[in-house]
Amino acid sequence: FFGSGPSIAKIFKEAEAEISLYKIEDMQPINEPWTMKFNCDWKSIVDIDSEGYHVPMGHKDYYDLVGRSYKDQVLKDKVSRSYGDIDAGKHKSQLNQDYVDTLPKESYLPPSHQRQWIYWSTFPGFVITLFPDQIEIYHSYPIGFQKSAMAGRSYALADDRPQMKSAR
């Protein structure tokens, strides 16, 4: 966690063009910072979090949202990208159905990103998740022997439209 490795900006250079579409510099926090603690080695969390095969069983709500369009990409420069198109069809989760039904159609994002979920990550455990209406940033880290934590926060552009408030 300390050392002379490349900066996060350099590692995420490949992601810069896509991430910049989301106007992160203009976003504000939309929730309080969160932390979860686990009784396991932090490398276990990072390994599982970076392997897409766990998504259908480990993240049933995300899988319900993006379904079979979910894909993982391993890219150069130590980053990976997962993505899926947010399905406009019927969802098992009522929360997902409500999200899809209320997410405004008008967006500052290009059409290619208006209904896409994107997950950029790099070792050790730093993640930027992009939704059409918000982003989430989190990281995983050790806090002791066989003890780990994950901490993050969500951000969004100011948007007073009732549909956007409902979607969020």
Question: What is each stretch, according to the model?
Answer:
Residues 1-168:
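C-terminal catalytic domain of Rieske-type non-heme iron oxygenases
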